[in-house]
Amino acid sequence: VTFSPLSAAFALAPRLPLGVVMRAAHVSVGLVARRGGAPIERLRANMARLTGEQPSRDLLVAAVRSHIRNYAEELMLGSSRGAPLLEGVSFDGFEALAAASEDGPVVLALGHSGSWDRAGAWVCAHGRVIVTVAEKVEPPSLFERFVALREGLGMEIIGVAKGESVFGSLVERVRGRSVIVPLLADRDISGSGIEVDLGRARALVAAGPAALATKLDRPLFVACITYENETPTGADVRVRCVGPVSVPKDLAPGANRVEALTQAWVSEFAAMMADKPQDWHMMQRVFVEDLDPERLARARAEHERKNR
C-alpha cells in the first residue's frame, strides 16, 4: 500500500475543528515560504509575468498562504465541521450565469485561483447543477476521495487520465441540459494548448472552454476566484464572473474562432487576476519563454499526428 500524506490529511483533518485546521495551515506558511524551492520560485516568476512587476517578499508569502489555505479548505469541505465554508462566498455575476444555463449548458472558464471547489459548492447549494472534469491523480484512492468530495457537494465529475481526451464524453453528458460546466483552463503544455497573451507574456492555455462552447453553440463565461477578509482562521471567497464572452467583431474571415474566443476569455481573466495575483496558484511552467522549445515542438507534432 502506497502511503500518501494528502490521503492521510483527508482522513485526519475532518475530525478536527475547522479553526484548528485553518490556523495550522496559516502557521505553516512561514516555514514553507522560508524553505523556498523550485515551486516557490516558479510562483514568483509567474506572478511577475502576469503583472509585469516582481512580487515583493510580503506578496510572495501571501501567495504561499493562499495556496495552502486552498488545500486546507479542500480537506474540510463536505464534512460537518467544514460547513461554515459554504458561507462567506460572494458571487458577482451569478444571476447572469444562472440565467444563461436555463435553456442549456453554459461553459465557465476558470483559472487555478482562490478556492474553486468552495465556489462550486456554493453554486450547487444555490440550485444549479455542475458538470466538470477532474484529472486523475495517484494513488487512485486519493482521486476517489476527491471525486467523492465533489460529488457529495452536488457536482458531477468526469475523470480524465494524463494524455486522455474526454471532450466527446463531456459533450454528450451536458448537451441539452441546464447545467454549468466549469473548466480549469489556465495551463496546457501538452501540445494541444493555445498560445495567448496572458498578462505581460505569451502562455499556453487549454482550448477546452472555447472548443466546448463552440461545439455546443452555447455561451462562454469566465470567472476569477479570490480571497478577501483574510484572518489566521480563514477567509471569505469572492467570485467575479463576466460573460458571455465573444470574439472580436472584426475577426478576420477564416480566422480560428476557438483561438479568438480563448484569447478573449484569457484577457478577461488576466485583468481580474492581476488585481490579486497572490491568489493565482500557478506553481508550474505556463509561459512560453519558460518552456523547452524542442520538447514543446515535439508535443505539438505528436498532437497534430493524432488529430490528422
Short names for language-model regions:
Residues G104-K162, G191-I194:
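Catalytic core of membrane glycerolipid acyltransferases/transacylases, capturing the structured
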Residues F94, V133-E135, V160, V242-P244, ...:
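Conserved beta-strand termini and adjacent loop/short-helix elements that scaffold enzyme active sites
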Residues E87-F91, H112-S113, P139, V160-E164, ...:
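A conditional alpha-helix N-cap/helix-loop micro-motif detector
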Residues V32, L50-E53, R57, V61, ...:
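Non-catalytic C-terminal accessory region of glycerolipid acyltransferases
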Residues I40-R42, K136-P140, R202-A206:
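Active-site metal-coordination segments of metallo-dependent hydrolases
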Residues S4, P39, V89, K162, ...:
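Soluble or luminal CAZymes and related metallo-dependent hydrolases
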Residues F94-A98, G120-C124, F143-V147, L170-V171, ...:
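Short amphipathic alpha-helical segments and helix-helix/interface helices
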Residues V1-L110, F143-A148, G154, R308:
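Membrane-anchoring hydrophobic helices of lipid-metabolizing enzymes
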